[in-house]
Amino acid sequence: MTDAASLADRVREGDLRLHELEAHADADTAAEARRLLVESQSGASLDAVGNYGFPAEAAESAIENMVGSIQVPMGVAGPVSVDGGSVAGEKYLPLATTEGALLASVNRGCSVINSAGGATARVLKSGMTRAPVFRVADVAEAEALVSWTRDNFAALKEAAEETTNHGELLDVTPYVVGNSVYLRFRYDTKDAMGMNMATIATEAVCGVVEAETAASLVALSGNLCSDKKPAAINAVEGRGRSVTADVRIPREVVEERLHTTPEAVAELNTRKNLVGSAKAASLGFNAHVANVVAAMFLATGQDEAQVVEGANAITTAEVQDGDLYVSVSIASLEVGTVGGGTKLPTQSEGLDILGVSGGGDPAGSNADALAECIAVGSLAGELSLLSALASRHLSSAHAELGR
């Protein structure tokens, strides 16, 4: 077996390219060779990056040109009682973050939720989207394509589902802009986040569209999907899981545990999360849902770039018979429990903490459960931060924790 130093020398000499090393050595040796190259060129020490706790081959489907692994501290909040459509009972929530005080805040929210009897969560809509863009001659041809698509949905569905053992084409929504036609296909991808599944299936469908109509495919993705970008269509129509969590907290719990009142939290939420967000033209009508989404995404192997869509959340707060009702509705939470980063050993353990690693029974139930847990974690984070702001304790809490 070729050693790392020899491989590094061959790259320097132009005999090998950086991405070809795994063909000449095991994945760990290839990663070591790349570290040697980077260290020699940059003067940096990659000792910590190279000190990772799983075989490099376990990451081969998740990364190219691997040199090692970063390590983000992971903690747990809870346990928190969850009454979900796909999850029930007390759950510890795994969060990986470098933001001090985040875990403490979410943990406080979980404790208060438990004092109120737990949170309720439900996935209300599910579907991964891909929206190719076609070129047509004019608006008359665009109308013809839209009509053809509606009349031939069964044929499109058959073509899509021939590419997958698990996915299902749910519907297609056309959008026309001049001589551009966007067809937004929505799929049930079960326990997979499903972007790859949706892309492969949509490619097959596009072949049928081009063969049977005058339309020409310009791009498999026309940005109406819309993936990894702030987009109102995701906030309104949803993408991935649309999930809501809520809790009703007795007045005495709010006053004794959160040191504020239901009225103060409700007013703050309206003026900050609703009016303030509207004035800022924000798509996120919440305090910091992205914090919890990002931390749980990292801990469970989700696509971290899709935190963009996960921040499409609305937090509501109102007084109900003297108690405080709080909800968080996340419109486009793109999660999976199979495929992608969920296969990495550390991230798989994060899913194990929640009891949702791998495919669920029935299919899709594990990803639904993960979405519900993230929604409850977000609810805990919102409740804690809003209360800290209402009681004017935010800065003192950070100071006490040395953050």
Curated annotation (Swiss-Prot):
Protein name, entry field: 3-hydroxy-3-methylglutaryl-coenzyme A reductase
EC number: 1.1.1.34
Gene: hmgA
PROSITE patterns in alphabetical order: HMG_COA_REDUCTASE_1, HMG_COA_REDUCTASE_2, HMG_COA_REDUCTASE_4
Purpose: Catalyzes the NADPH-dependent reductive deacylation of (S)-3-hydroxy-3-methylglutaryl-CoA (HMG-CoA) to (R)-mevalonate. Functions in the mevalonate (MVA) pathway leading to isopentenyl diphosphate (IPP), a key precursor for the biosynthesis of isoprenoid compounds such as archaeal membrane lipids. Is also able to catalyze the reduction of mevaldehyde to mevalonate and the oxidative acylation of mevaldehyde to HMG-CoA.
Signal peptide limits: none
Enzyme class (EC, first level): oxidoreductase
Organism, as annotated: Haloferax volcanii (strain ATCC 29605 / DSM 3757 / JCM 8879 / NBRC 14742 / NCIMB 2012 / VKM B-1768 / DS2)
Domain of life: Archaea
Alphabetized GO MF terms: hydroxymethylglutaryl-CoA reductase (NADPH) activity
GO biological process: coenzyme A metabolic process; isoprenoid biosynthetic process; sterol biosynthetic process
Listed InterPro entries: HMG_CoA_Rdtase, HMG_CoA_Rdtase_cat_sf, HMG_CoA_Rdtase_CS, HMG_CoA_Rdtase_eu_arc, HMG_CoA_Rdtase_NAD(P)-bd_sf, HMG_CoA_Rdtase_sub-bd_dom_sf
Catalytic residues, chain numbering: 99 (charge relay system), 303 (charge relay system), 398 (proton donor)
Pathway assigned to this chain's UniProt record: Metabolic intermediate biosynthesis; (R)-mevalonate biosynthesis; (R)-mevalonate from acetyl-CoA: step 3/3
